[in-house]
Amino acid sequence: MVKLSIVLTPRFLSHDQGQLTKELQQHVKSVTCPCEYLRKVINTLADHRHRGTDFGGSPWLLIITVFLRSYKFAISLCTSYLCVSFLKTIFPSQNGHDGSTDVQQRARRSNRRRQEGIKIVLEDIFTLWRQVETKVRAKICKMKVTTKVNRHDKINGKRKTAKEHLRKLSMKEREHGEKERQVSEAEENGKLDMKEIHTYMEMFQRAQALRRRAEDYYRCKITPSARKPLCNRVRMAAAEHRHSSGLPYWPYLTAETLKNRMGHQPPPPTQQHSIIDNSLSLKTPPECLLTPLPPSALPSADDNLKTPAECLLYPLPPSADDNLKTPPECLLTPLPPSAPPSADDNLKTPPKCVCSLPFHPQRMIISRN
């Protein structure tokens, strides 16, 4: 089945439209008809009525006007695109791409990178320009200084150039650096000297500690009960030796005479003993050097007060009581053996040997125990 609109196709159009409509109305009685019947109707038409297609008819004009009205905007876009493409072909772009989307994106990226590179280059140029400006300003200041100096020296009959001024400045800087180096070397040498002094002080303090330990050990060997009688006996023997021989008072002579009278003979000196005897005083008994020294406490301010009186090596001044006659029986008779040491040893000392000799108070020295 074919619709009636087929009649309006260009194949059935002719110049005499009225005749064609009459013939169609005679043969076509309904809206639809079979195709074969239409073919018969078309074949019955005369040949002069089918001279070819005619584009000047009213239907085509209607179609063209509708198309122009509806697609006016599309036609304007097409014309603009054609104009742009024509202009691009005439004036080639600087990027050199073919107009595709990927190429355009790449070109935009490259343009951005190029702009960033241009920014970096501009920043570098600005920094270089600032550096050059600072250098030029420094040179101008130096030139001003040199001109002022030259004017001042020209009045006084002198003349200086910029090179001489710079040379003097460099010499001053070198002298300042040399002084700083010498000061640093002096500080380092002073630190080394202070370290050496500190080591020497430590060695001296250790020697003092050893000496105090030896003195403490020698004092501790004598019992408290025998300290005061021993001191009195030593002084009496010294007084007797002085009256008999006429020699001045020396503690080591007193110790020798006391040992001879008590019948105590010292052992023969050995090599180690002789070496130690040279370092220590002559009054130290030999039995005190053979035994090791015990550990002592730290040195204190009371060590000088505990030193026995027989350690004094300088002679006492002469007095008027030197010509007194000492009874010999007090010097020759030994003291009785004492009891074990106790707190009341000083009170139990026999007074007959202490009070029998009229010693002068300046000559009488009692140890502090």
Curated annotation (Swiss-Prot):
Protein name: Nuclear pore complex-interacting protein family member A2
One family name in Pfam for this protein: NPIP
Domain of life (superkingdom): Eukaryota
UniProt gene name: NPIPA2
Organism: Homo sapiens
UniProt region (Disordered), positions on chain: 325-346
Similarity-based family: Belongs to the NPIP family.
Residues that span the membrane, as ranges: none
